[in-house]
């Protein structure tokens, strides 16, 4: 399988399937597409899969990802769906090594914490 030709950027998303959602990642795996995703740390240092620094575009909520704990973030829905912001661990379990992942680290303070935590998971 040639995984390098097409990459599902933030998963295989559409009008009905939000980017960086577990459904978008499942669909990419079903189509045997490599996946690019972005990770950030929450206030309580959990690794979530989310592209933007702030929550407005995807969740309609004021504030940055780092301003909230994962428990708080998990109550927010992605766009107009029932999908929530996934943990990296949930995405890794969903993908289960079936397709290549390109993980972009969206780092902020504290510098090095995200890198260390992602490295430990791999």
Task: Give the location of each predicted region.
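Phosphate-group recognition and catalysis centered on beta-loop-alpha active-site segments
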Residues: 1-122
């Amino acid at each position: 399988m040639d995984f390098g030709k097409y990459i599902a950027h933030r998963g295989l998303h559409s009008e009905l399937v939000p980017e960086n959602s577990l459904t978008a990642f499942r669909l990419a795996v079903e189509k045997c597409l490599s996946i690019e995703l972005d990770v950030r740390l929450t206030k309580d240092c959990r690794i979530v899969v989310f592209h933007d620094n702030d929550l407005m575009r995807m969740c309609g909520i004021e504030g940055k990802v780092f301003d909230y704990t994962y428990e708080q973030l998990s109550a927010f829905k992605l766009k107009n769906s029932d999908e929530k912001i996934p943990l990296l661990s949930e995405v890794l379990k969903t993908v289960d090594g079936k397709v290549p992942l390109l993980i972009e680290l969206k780092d902020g303070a504290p510098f090095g914490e995200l890198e260390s935590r992602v490295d430990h998971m791999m």
